[in-house]
């Protein structure tokens, strides 16, 4: 959106390990030698942590607040004010909200760490991509009915009328379709229709003990929409899994595919 890269911009991810400000960023396949040179599209297809974090650190490392401000323009950090209790609150803290913003904060934020974004906020964001850039507040109640008559309707509320430019929107929609069609999210796809979306795999912090205590737990997810060409449904699947590293594409993507195909089969108007 800031015009710094295109889908064809190339990053050399090397052997899957990249030193960053005293720490090492790794791709999931670093033990197999990594991916080498990848375009931005390919970085998202294979979920390259190295590629993603390098881009964000390279272009925003000198001004992290600009990156944070860009996220906020897309309203991904906005409370949803849902109709039911128990809503999680997003928390994305930039340099202005911290007494100390380390050099490693930005690259690790770029792959989902050091932030708190509830699944429904992520789904709302992807739904906006499917909805031509219009971000809509999720609602669980369409209308209140008494004795067969509607006594109150709950209209659709717009959170953000345009999360990004039409050019950026077209590019990211094409990439998200390739993530499923050609990338690690193939299990989320269907032979009956095209699916677009993105995988996610994150290690869950064990409270004050951080990421290194006891059994490692992972949150694997897939968020997307279908059919890609004329989106009608958006969905997120999140699974908490203990033990070895898990794959968002394989686990959550497979569940997404099964649900999507059932919905598709029941909706003859698609």
Provide a role label for each language-model segment.
Residues 119-124, 251-258:
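Short amphipathic alpha-helical face segments that pack within enzyme cores
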Residues 150-157, 253-270:
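Short, gly/Ser/Thr-rich active-site loops of penicillin-recognizing serine hydrolases
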Residues 1-239:
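Beta-lactam-recognizing serine transpeptidase/beta-lactamase-like catalytic domain environment
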Residues 239-251:
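A short acidic/glycine-rich loop-to-helix N-cap element
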